[in-house]
């Protein structure tokens, strides 16, 4: 098994070096694929991993420390490091799986008809922020009220 994995790793290293130098119909490889997201080649791994939904600064630092990978550019990864990185990121909840989980939790709040669920249903903030003058992100763009007249100028 080890011999097969080692040969797969060397084959992967060769393909990666070819992909760095080869263009296909004028297109170049811009990054590596980790956790169903594209990690750019020209960014350090610590910031590049943050492109994956559900991985922020803290978790990317934890992943790299656990693997013992320094904060180098994504294009400088060896095949073994890339395989280990994909396996490590795969152990955490990320991407579409995390989006589905968050959506189902919000749907559960709406179905239970608790306060937070009703705020989600009406598109209002649910953590106590004021809504009289702010909350534009949640409520959307401000709409003018028809029939409201401006005060006359003196």
Curated annotation (Swiss-Prot):
InterPro entries xref list: Rbsml_uS13_C, Ribosomal_uS13, Ribosomal_uS13-like_H2TH, Ribosomal_uS13_CS
Keywords: Mitochondrion, Ribonucleoprotein, Ribosomal protein, RNA-binding, rRNA-binding, Transit peptide
GO biological process terms held by the UniProt record: translation
Localization in the cell: Mitochondrion
An annotated GO cellular component: mitochondrial small ribosomal subunit
Keyword Ribosomal protein recorded: yes
Keyword Hydrolase listed: no
Subunit structure: Part of the small ribosomal subunit.
Protein name per Swiss-Prot or TrEMBL: Small ribosomal subunit protein uS13m
């Amino acid at each position: 098994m080890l011999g097969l994995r080692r040969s797969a790793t060397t084959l992967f290293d060769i393909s990666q070096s070819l992909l760095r130098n080869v263009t296909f119909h004028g297109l170049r490889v811009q990054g590596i694929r980790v956790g169903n997201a594209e990690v750019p080649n020209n960014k350090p791994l610590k910031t590049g991993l943050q492109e994956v939904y559900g991985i922020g600064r803290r978790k990317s630092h934890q992943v790299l420390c656990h693997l013992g990978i320094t904060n180098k550019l994504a294009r400088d990864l060896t095949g073994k490091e890339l395989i280990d990185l994909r396996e490590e990121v795969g152990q955490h909840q990320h991407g579409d799986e995390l989006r589905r989980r968050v959506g189902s939790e919000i749907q559960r709040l709406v179905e239970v008809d608790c306060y937070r669920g009703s705020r989600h249903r009406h598109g209002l903030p649910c953590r106590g922020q004021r809504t009289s003058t702010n909350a534009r992100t949640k409520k959307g763009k401000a709409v003018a009220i028809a029939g409201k007249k401006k005060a006359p100028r003196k």
